[in-house]
């Protein structure tokens, strides 16, 4: 493993260049990115930005989370097959921001643990993915502590002339490791003023088979020894005849997208964007593997259908008369529903908890550009309305009774408001200045209507918080391909409804209760980026340090003076999020590309992250900090054939580096922690004509058994993937 990592350090991989999957000599500085919301040359941005645009790479993944995983640019945690929780520079879930087409996916119930919301965005219709590394609160507001994942779906394309013309794609994908079947169709119908883009994807996933090649030190790790069925009204723990089949991991998902573009002239656009995503029930696999005294703890534990509905209208204008030449406004509405259903083994009581969130949002951005640079002014408002319900059903008598809701059961709202200003100034001789400020105000009002079950010592939780965030940095772009950038930035995250009002258990015997006195978290970041980009090779390095102030860590707490309470029929230790810590997170990334033969490149990336906080006088590991991770590959490509042999790897995460009170899920690791691993993979794409593209991949060729840090499910074993894309 040591020699392997040395190879990574020598050859590296430019995350941005790998993401392009481009064998031409395009200079990194010439790449246009949307990190600043308006199209900007990446050389004019101090912050590190990762870019993924290869359509074959994007389309050949099982879901959007796997795009990030397989790129090697972002660590992703999974609790179940239908999941994927990105981690950027040691920050995860509600501490990073997910965006789709300029709209915030983060909402008032985004939890601080692990999320699966990213899979509700269909990767089959994605055009590009951008990753902003580090605090990005100046332009993006609350939650962007660790960074931003920007997902952009395809844009409708206009045609010449008044007559409508149609074109589109059909994609069929099959993968053996999970009996995966995915069908995708998209059609673009357009003339010179109107364009209609329609997309449909249907996905079916079976039980996920983990690798059979286990470490001799942990010969039974990850084995699925049992599964539960109910026969004649009785729960039965059955012996699993194939311990590598992770039973109860299958699910289905349907995604729809409709865009309507109207472009009355060269300088004005109107865009309607509708997205619908709905899944089947998705079993919480990690919970279904828990045991007590040799018996399963749960007979059932699953997420109900995960629904995400989005409608947005975007108005764009350019060459406007006046100080600002470019502008856009996005008004959006989202409706989100998620639920959790659980039943203990041999119990007739089945608990249903459902959350519905309605979100209204609007943001307006203006851009002034001249020979000295540009000035970007923006305003933003989002309003979240949360409804939380719960009940218990006796599956024997069908009688319903009351149980605690996950969040406050009365009227619950959050509002985000901001005004921001960002400047890019050309100082001459290759020097560029970035600086900006943002004023944030967040309001939260949660009402606890029924306190008879939990006996809350309060009936509401109200907060109004204001925060000023900003950034400043310098970049130097030399004429010989060298680039150096140094930046300072701050981030801000206001406690949301999930932080302030939630009652839940991350695992049996451990319950988290509300702490209405929780305050906002802040990050202060310094980073240095150095790179060199030439015809035959490119390399880059990023070093960062983040001070995490007012960090909310989950720690022991009391509820009505009690350190233990009865929850879900189990006497449980009480915990709550508390602003107890000042944490330090630091790390680096090295990356590069080397052209070894014509159209043949070696590419690689390696990321190291470390995070600690002080609990009194004791220094403790911060949770969510991934082990070292990365990717190395050799790729040959031309117009007809692309082939890449690559490896994805993770280093050790020793138990001494786990946060045992947080979200690191040590119960799903070995006694020593999460072992290091590496996989060998092959991906090929053959394009016999402009209308047909054929793909063949083998993931995890050696059938390695492994698991990502903090994950409750083992990764897929040897997996054969066939795909066919027909364009018309």
Question: Residue locations for each model-derived region?
Answer:
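N-terminal periplasmic "start-of-domain" segments of outer-membrane beta-barrel proteins
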Residues: 30-58, 85
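Short acidic/polar hinge/loop motifs at secondary-structure boundaries
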Residues: 105-135
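Outer membrane beta-barrel strand-and-loop segments of large Gram-negative receptors
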Residues: 355, 359-365, 416-418, 513-519, ...
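N-terminal periplasmic accessory domains that precede
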Residues: 62-68, 84-87, 98-99, 116-119, ...
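Transmembrane beta-barrel wall of Gram-negative outer-membrane proteins
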Residues: 178-204, 214-281, 307-309, 427, ...
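Gram-negative outer-membrane beta-barrel transporters
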Residues: 428-429, 433, 441-442, 545-547, ...
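Flexible loop and strand-edge segments within Gram-negative outer membrane beta-barrel domains
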Residues: 247-253, 263-324, 335-357, 406, ...
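Surface-exposed extracellular loop regions of Gram-negative outer-membrane beta-barrel proteins
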Residues: 280, 335-339, 392-399, 443-454, ...
């Amino acid at each position: 493993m040591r020699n392997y990592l040395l190879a990574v350090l020598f050859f590296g991989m430019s995350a941005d260049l790998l993401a392009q999957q481009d064998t031409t000599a395009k200079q990194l500085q010439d790449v246009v990115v949307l990190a600043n919301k308006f199209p900007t040359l990446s050389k004019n941005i101090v912050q590190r930005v990762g870019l993924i645009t290869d359509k074959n790479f994007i389309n050949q993944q099982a879901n959007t989370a796997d795009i990030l995983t397989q790129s090697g640019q972002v660590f992703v945690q999974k609790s179940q097959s239908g999941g994927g929780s990105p981690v950027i520079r040691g920050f995860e879930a509600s501490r990073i921001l997910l965006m789709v087409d300029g709209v915030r996916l983060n909402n008032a119930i985004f939890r601080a643990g692990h999320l699966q919301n990213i899979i509700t965005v269909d990767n089959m219709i994605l055009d590009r993915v951008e990753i902003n590394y580090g605090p990005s609160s100046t332009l993006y507001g609350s939650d962007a502590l660790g960074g931003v994942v920007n997902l952009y779906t395809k844009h409708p394309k206009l045609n010449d002339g008044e007559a409508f013309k149609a074109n589109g794609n059909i994609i069929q994908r099959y993968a053996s490791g999970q009996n995966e079947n995915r069908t995708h169709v998209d059609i673009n119908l357009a003339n010179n003023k109107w364009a209609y883009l329609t997309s449909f994807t249907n996905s079916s996933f079976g039980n996920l088979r983990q690798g059979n090649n286990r470490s001799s030190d942990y010969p039974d790790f990850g084995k699925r020894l049992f599964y539960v069925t109910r026969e004649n009204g009785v729960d039965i723990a059955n012996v699993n005849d194939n311990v590598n089949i992770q039973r109860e991991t299958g699910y289905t998902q349907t995604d729809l997208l409709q865009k309507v573009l109207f472009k009355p002239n060269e300088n004005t656009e109107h865009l309607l964007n509708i997205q619908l995503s709905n899944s089947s029930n998705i079993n919480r696999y990690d919970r279904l593997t828990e045991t007590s005294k040799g018996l399963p703890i749960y007979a059932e534990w699953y997420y109900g259908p995960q629904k995400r509905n989005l409608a947005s209208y975007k108005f764009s204008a350019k060459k406007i008369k006046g100080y600002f030449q470019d502008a856009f406004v996005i008004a959006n509405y989202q409706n989100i529903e998620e639920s959790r259903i659980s039943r203990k083994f041999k119990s007739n009581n089945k608990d249903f908890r459902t959350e519905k969130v309605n979100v209204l949002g609007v943001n307006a951005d203006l851009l002034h550009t001249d020979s000295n640079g540009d000035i970007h002014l923006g305003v933003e408002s989002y309003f979240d309305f949360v409804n939380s319900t719960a009940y218990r059903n006796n599956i024997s008598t069908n009688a319903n009774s009351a149980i605690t809701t996950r969040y406050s059961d009365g009227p619950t709202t959050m509002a985000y408001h901001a005004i921001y200003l960002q400047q890019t100034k050309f100082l001459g001789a290759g020097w560029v200045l970035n600086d900006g400020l943002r004023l944030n105000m967040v309001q939260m009002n949660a009402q606890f209507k029924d306190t008879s079950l939990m006996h809350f010592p309060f009936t509401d939780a109200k907060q109004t918080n204001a925060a000023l965030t900003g950034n400043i940095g310098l970049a130097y772009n030399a004429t010989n391909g060298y680039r150096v950038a140094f930046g300072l930035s701050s981030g801000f995250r206001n406690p949301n409804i999930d932080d302030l009002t939630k009652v839940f258990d991350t695992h049996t015997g451990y319950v988290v209760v509300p702490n209405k006195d929780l305050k906002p978290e802040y990050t202060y970041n310094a980073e240095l980026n150095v790179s060199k980009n030439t015809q035959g090779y490119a390399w880059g390095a990023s070093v960062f340090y983040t001070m995490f102030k007012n960090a909310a860590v989950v720690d022991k707490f009391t509820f009505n003076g009690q350190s233990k309470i009865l929850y879900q029929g189990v006497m449980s230790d009480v915990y709550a999020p508390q602003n107890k810590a000042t944490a330090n997170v630091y790390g680096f990334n090295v990356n590069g590309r080397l052209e070894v033969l014509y159209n043949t490149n070696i590419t690689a990336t390696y990321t190291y992250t470390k995070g600690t906080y002080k609990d009194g006088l004791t220094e403790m590991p911060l949770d969510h900090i991934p082990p070292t991770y990365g990717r190395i590959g050799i790729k040959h490509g031309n117009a007809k054939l692309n082939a890449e042999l690559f490896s994805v790897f993770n280093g050790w995460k020793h138990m001494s580096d786990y946060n045992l009170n947080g979200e690191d899920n040590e119960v799903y690791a070995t006694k020593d922690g999460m072992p290091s691993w590496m996989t060998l993979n092959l991906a090929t794409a053959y394009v016999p004509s402009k209308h047909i593209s054929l793909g063949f991949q083998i993931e995890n060729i050696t059938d390695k058994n492994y698991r990502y840090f903090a994950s409750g499910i083992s990764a897929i074993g040897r997996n054969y993937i066939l795909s066919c894309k027909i364009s018309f």
